Amino acid sequence: MSFDINWSTLESDNRLNDLIRKHLNSYLQNTQLPSYVSNLRVLDFDLGKVGPAITLKEITDPLDEFYDSIREEADQETEENNDNKEDSEHVCPDRTIANHEGPKDDFEAPVVMPSPNDIQFLLEVEYKGDLLVTIGADLVLNYPVEKFMTLPVKLSISDIGLHSLCIVACLSKQLFLSFLCDVSDPALDDNQTVLDPKGPILAATKPLERISIVRSMKIETEIGEQYQGQGSVLRSVGELEQFLFTIFKDFLRKELAWPSWINLDFNDGDE
């Protein structure tokens, strides 16, 4: 069974686009960069106007791992609350005596039990939309000496294609999302990833992995006209594009591919 989502509500949400941009930048800050690139950052993120095609494959109960995650988070919050309570008791000795009458004053972790309203969907997600990521970087030329020249470049990542199975679980006012595996798709399996529209086209030569999430993408680079004919600059640009392609795929796999997931908690607004 297929259904539509109100994608326009998401793509017009500037806060969501900015949140994703900041999350990507946080990941890049913890990524070791090669010697030929520095100051790598995401300048802009746009979800685009074309949403994914989603097909519902199965409805089940949520996986135990999601309940375990909620319990672990609740236990951690309870431990932190009790630690804060002990700190405040040390500040006021008179209140300390009253608070040590028994364990009843300690914070207790809430019991997380499955509810009849808990539900999990197995979804087939196909995306060939117009998402756009704009990245800025400084290209470092280390010849004839180290850091001989630094060139600012701007890269655009577009034409992203994916076709995967994922699970979406709703429980305890929280939503969990994780990708399980890629789905065979001739349009993507045969597609060639363009890393330089004016240079050679690089095609994937390895067998399809269990999960790539991103199966195709295009990277375009803008550099000053005075450097476009220099072989060393073009080689560095090609290496940078390949590096971006790799870390972009790695980011999605680490953040979204099972056994990892993203978790949206809607309990914060409750009093």
From Swiss-Prot:
Q: One of this protein's GO BP terms?
A: mitochondrion-endoplasmic reticulum membrane tethering
According to the entry, every stretch annotated as the SMP-LTD domain falls at: 1-267
Keywords, sorted A to Z: Endoplasmic reticulum, Isopeptide bond, Lipid transport, Lipid-binding, Membrane, Mitochondrion, Mitochondrion outer membrane, Transport, Ubl conjugation
Which parts of the sequence are annotated with region: Disordered? Answer: 73-108
Membrane topology (UniProt) = Peripheral membrane protein
Residue ranges with Basic and acidic residues bias:
82-107
Query: Its family?
Result: Belongs to the MDM12 family.
Domain notes for this protein? The SMP-LTD domain is a barrel-like domain that can bind various types of glycerophospholipids in its interior and mediate their transfer between two adjacent bilayers.
CC terms in the record's Gene Ontology section: endoplasmic reticulum membrane; ERMES complex
Q: State the Gene Ontology terms under molecular function.
A: lipid binding
Q: What does this protein do?
A: Component of the ERMES/MDM complex, which serves as a molecular tether to connect the endoplasmic reticulum (ER) and mitochondria. Components of this complex are involved in the control of mitochondrial shape and protein biogenesis, and function in nonvesicular lipid trafficking between the ER and mitochondria. MDM12 is required for the interaction of the ER-resident membrane protein MMM1 and the outer mitochondrial membrane-resident beta-barrel protein MDM10.
Which HAMAP family does this one have? Mdm12
Cite the location of the cross-link Glycyl lysine isopeptide (Lys-Gly) (interchain with G-Cter in ubiquitin) from the record: K49
What PROSITE patterns has UniProt attached to this entry? SMP (PS51847)
Q: Where in the cell is it found?
A: Mitochondrion outer membrane; Endoplasmic reticulum membrane
Indicate what this protein is called per its UniProt record: Mitochondrial distribution and morphology protein 12
Give the organism, scientific name. Answer: Saccharomyces cerevisiae (strain RM11-1a)
Q: How does it assemble?
A: Component of the ER-mitochondria encounter structure (ERMES) or MDM complex, composed of MMM1, MDM10, MDM12 and MDM34. A MMM1 homodimer associates with one molecule of MDM12 on each side in a pairwise head-to-tail manner, and the SMP-LTD domains of MMM1 and MDM12 generate a continuous hydrophobic tunnel for phospholipid trafficking. Interacts with PUF3.
Q: Does the keyword Endoplasmic reticulum apply?
A: yes
Highest taxon above the source species = Eukaryota
